[in-house]
């Protein structure tokens, strides 16, 4: 599976794509675990190991794709009013992705250990011959070494065969790939940690600006309240002065009227 960047810049579609990938990673990890449990049993076969490797590669690609989607989701523009809700949504996706990554890395480590055990058995069996059912299917017999029922063995001085070398090289190559995939997952974990830290700094800055704005609004409201009080007092004083003037005019008018009589 290859990464196809962008879903039209739609946060809802991008979040849905991320959630879908997380579910796939979780499902694939469970399938890988079931396959690992079949290794070393009668169900083991080269075909089964090939399917296991393909499933691991597919899941590893999913993790890289999801990491890019989450980065894209975090870089989408947003308004201050949407910021907190976007952060909650992103934190949820990051948490779910981290859980699925942890499970996948766990089964990857188990797969690497199984491959190392297989190589060790191949190396050991290269100098051991036993009463195996078919000489032509040596790989199947080596894989099922643990499930054999007490074969009669004797040590020989023969050198390691070309088939043994081929098996060892294939498994060692698989081990190197698994270890590289595990390192890739570690890098994704680091990316997720950085994204959470940066997102937290952005939110803290926005919250600080909002708090400062609220303080300024409160101060402005207090100033407006004081101005309104002052205006009411000024109007009251003006009304009293006018009333006094009116009373004074009435009194003067009465005095003049009395003198004229």
UniProtKB/Swiss-Prot annotation:
The highest taxon in the source lineage is: Eukaryota
Q: Would you tell me the Gene Ontology cellular component terms?
A: early endosome membrane; SNARE complex; synaptic vesicle
Record-linked Pfam families: SNARE, Syntaxin_2
Positions of the t-SNARE coiled-coil homology domain? 165-227
Those parts of the protein on the Cytoplasmic side are 2-238
Locations listed in the record: Early endosome membrane
Q: Keyword set for this entry?
A: Acetylation, Coiled coil, Endosome, Membrane, Phosphoprotein, Transmembrane, Transmembrane helix
* Claim: Coiled coil is one of the keywords in the record: yes
- Coiled-coil residue windows: 47-69
- Primary location recorded for the protein, binned into one broad class: membrane
Residue positions where N-acetylserine is found in the record: 2
Where in this protein does the record say Phosphoserine is found? 45, 75, 125-126, 129, 205
- Any transmembrane segments, and where? 239-259
Q: Does the keyword Coiled coil apply?
A: yes
Q: Which family does it belong to?
A: Belongs to the syntaxin family.
Q: What does this protein do?
A: May be involved in protein trafficking from the plasma membrane to the early endosome (EE) as well as in homotypic fusion of endocytic organelles. Mediates the endocytic trafficking from early endosomes to late endosomes and lysosomes.
Q: How does it assemble?
A: Forms a SNARE complex with VTI1B, STX8 and VAMP8 which functions in the homotypic fusion of late endosomes. Component of the SNARE complex composed of STX7, STX8, VAMP7 and VTI1B that is required for heterotypic fusion of late endosomes with lysosomes. Interacts with VPS11, VPS16 and VPS18. Interacts with VPS33A. Interacts with TPC1.
The name on file for this protein is: Syntaxin-7
* Gene that specifies this protein: STX7
